[in-house]
Amino acid sequence: GFGCPNNYQCHRHCKSIPGRCGGYCGGWHRLRCTCYRCGGRREDVEDIFDIFDNEAADRF
């Protein structure tokens, strides 16, 4: 599920998505891969990938 709890695999997964520069594992037991847009501003985090259903949930 998008590599979490391994930050490196999550980051690589996010970089493969157009418009995303990376990602990190967070949430309960670090099982959620959160991707961020290029620019690195915290409020630009948009897509959250959950290891349980592997679907993107739009935050906005």
UniProtKB/Swiss-Prot annotation:
Classification via Gene3D superfamilies: Knottin, scorpion toxin-like
Compartment list: Secreted
Disulfide bridge map: C4-C25, C10-C33, C14-C35, C21-C38
Keywords tagged on the record: Amidation, Antibiotic, Antimicrobial, Defensin, Disulfide bond, Hydroxylation, Immunity, Innate immunity, Secreted
Residues recorded as bearing Cysteine amide in the entry: C38
3-hydroxytryptophan, modified sites: W28
GO cellular component, one term: extracellular region
Note, other: The Cys-4-Pro-5 bond is in cis conformation.
Function field: Active against both Gram-positive and Gram-negative bacteria but is not cytotoxic towards human erythrocytes or protozoa.
Protein name: Defensin MGD-1
Gene that this polypeptide is encoded by: FH3
